[in-house]
Amino acid sequence: MFITVINHLARNSSDSQVYGIRMANDYINAQQREVVHQLGRNWLWRSELPTWALMVGVYGGWFGCVIYWQTLGLFLTTLLLIVFTTWYMSLQHELIHGHPTRFPRLNQLFGTLPLAVWYPYGLYRDSHLAHHRNHTLTEPDEDPETYYLSPERWAQLKPWQQRLIHLRNTFPGRLLLGPLLDIVATLKMMLLARDLAAVAMWVIHLTLLGGLFYWMQQQGLSPLWFVVAVSYPALALTKIRSFYEHRAEEAPLARSVNNEAAWPWRLLFLNLNYHSVHHDLPGLPWYGLRKVYLLYRDGYHQRNHGFRVAGYGEWLLRFWRKPVNVNAHPGTHKDAQHADHFTADVRYPPSDDAWPDRSANDAAETTRRAG
């Protein structure tokens, strides 16, 4: 199944056909397009040195912690591994979007090691690229990363299941309960996998994971400890970033948040807190998201209808006990009425775009992840 990122604003967008798929950037205006092009001509940006340095830091830090854990001590090693494992998941996302190389197979190689344990890189890639169809963003039957349920599915849930969803939709619940629900859904997906490509991904993933656990055991570090004390908390940290990252809105460009988080979170999540910018410019490298956001902060505030938050602490205070209203999807009728505007064309040669989304697309079928 081909994965497409759709162009919503034809006048202010520039397409590029990469790996047989037309991707699109949604610029605020022509001036922003020119500014992004100028930034893209910078040698440092084009060299992708920040991403190469990031890979060295993440891999070096992760394996260094395991090798020298007895010197560091178990407590410090655990804390550092939580950070490096979370960082690795952020790096995998960057690899999916075509960085640091133009070769998807090479990028896949950089992200295939199961340092985060829970899912194969290829399945995450396919699911995430389907998520980037902005015109169906948040829709339960179309967006594999949505937390919304269809009204029919919501009505079928038992009262205790609805209460569980409400609990998950609080900030503490998303961190504590969210990873468990995701893991259960992932295991269910693995057991029900029938597609040969998906089965192959799981076989490779589990084989590599077994080898990684064996090596870890040889270093004297318990794989069980790693799963419980490192991998689960790391997955929980990613739930901080994704908490209320999207909302159901009629306008597709108003469905993604811009979270003005503090620098430690920005670094850990590779600036994906500027999520509206990322969805508008999916090929922009992580080190460009904040710069572009700050240059056009007011424009993005207007574009996404004020969906902006001052940091993750604001979500914590607002949704410590109160659940965010992400359960039954309310529906977005405007998209259905204007679906012709979101038809991707994969036949034509690329235009000159400074930052096309060089996402990999070599899987046979999109694999959905339950949310």
Feature names for model-found ranges:
Residues 100-119, 140-155, 253-265:
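Juxtamembrane helix-capping/reentrant segments at transmembrane boundaries
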Residues 72, 95-103, 121, 187, ...:
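Membrane-interface elements of multi-pass transporters and channels
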Residues 96-97, 135, 249, 269, ...:
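Short active-site segment of divalent metal-dependent hydrolases/proteases
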Residues 256-275, 284:
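Functional transmembrane helices that form membrane-embedded active or gating regions
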Residues 93, 128, 158, 246, ...:
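Divalent metal-coordination and catalytic microenvironments
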Residues 2-87, 114-224, 287-371:
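Non-catalytic, topology-defining segments of multipass membrane proteins
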Residues 77-109, 130:
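Long, highly hydrophobic alpha-helical transmembrane signal-anchor segments
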Residues 83-95, 120, 124, 174-179, ...:
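Transmembrane alpha-helical segments that form the membrane-embedded catalytic/substrate-channel core
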